[in-house]
Design a protein with these regions (language model features):
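Zinc-dependent deaminase catalytic domain
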Residues: 1-145
Length: 145
């Protein structure tokens, strides 16, 4: 589901999705990286470098999934994400009561933000697990009958 959610992102460089699941394996919420509601994708920059970048504006997938839960309790839940959460998302994960992070990629493993994230998650007792998969692509076939 996190991979499907990532397909909704309009970011030309990085599409990240998140899916929050209850201890009973019920999907509670999904999210993807993008601009806040009401901020047009056409009016804000998607650039990664230069004077005007996306970074001050983009809401990460994890935070969007937490906010999209709209008051549902996330205590004890798991969050599945394409990319290991940054330090800001780790704070939201911890504060929301999510107890496990399952991630697909850790491509920024040695950056200060990711190292801080790992430290906070570990200190807060949040379980972190890398999803091992042999799949390199996800293909959906839809046949209308």
């Amino acid at each position: 589901m996190a991979l499907l959610a990532s397909c909704r992102s309009k970011d030309p460089n990085t599409q990240v999705g998140a899916c929050i699941v209850s201890p009973e394996n019920i999907i509670l919420s999904t999210g993807y990286n993008g601009f806040p509601v009401g901020c047009s994708d056409d009016e804000y920059p998607w650039e990664r470098e230069g004077e005007h970048t996306k970074y001050p504006y983009v809401v990460h997938a994890e935070l969007n999934a937490i906010l999209n839960a709209s008051g549902k309790s996330l205590r004890g839940a798991r969050i599945y994400v394409d990319l290991f959460p940054c330090n800001e998302c780790a704070k939201a994960i911890i504060q929301s009561g999510i107890r496990e992070v399952i991630y697909l990629s850790d491509k920024y493993a040695e950056t200060p933000a990711t190292l801080a994230s790992k430290r906070m998650l570990r200190s807060a007792g949040v379980t972190v697990r890398h999803l091992e998969t042999c799949l390199s692509t996800l293909t959906l076939n839809y046949h209308k009958k």
